[in-house]
Amino acid sequence: IEKCGKINGFYMGLSALNRYGLTTQVPNTTEICTNNETSKLRSVKVGNMSVILRKSRTAITNENVDILSFLELMNSLSMDSFDDEKRDILCSLVQEKGINRQQISRYAPLFPDKAMRNLIESEIIYYVAQ
């Protein structure tokens, strides 16, 4: 999510999973992680749409938005329904966004263990560039 050429946030949770084709569920609430939120979690109404705003784990910049949104995706994934199609989507995303192991090492400590566990169990880690 961008304002005046500066990245301020990104979609997360079911909203992000649906945008990337990782789920067919359509959320009735959009979740957004943003720099502009001071509370940990806040729910607002925009017209007739419900939006959950979450405070970012770290400052979101043009340089780190891709790795942060990717790690949030990995944190939101359920491994119960993980298949080859989802692996292909995530591998393409890793390559498209240029995500590398140095970025993962830098930002992984900010996320719950589930994000890294999913990254390893899904074998996506093997597709990440050195």
Regions flagged by a language model, labelled:
Residues 52-130:
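Hydrophobic alpha-helical interaction segments
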Residues 1-48:
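Short gly/ser-rich loop at a beta-strand->alpha-helix junction or flexible surface loop bordering the NTP-binding
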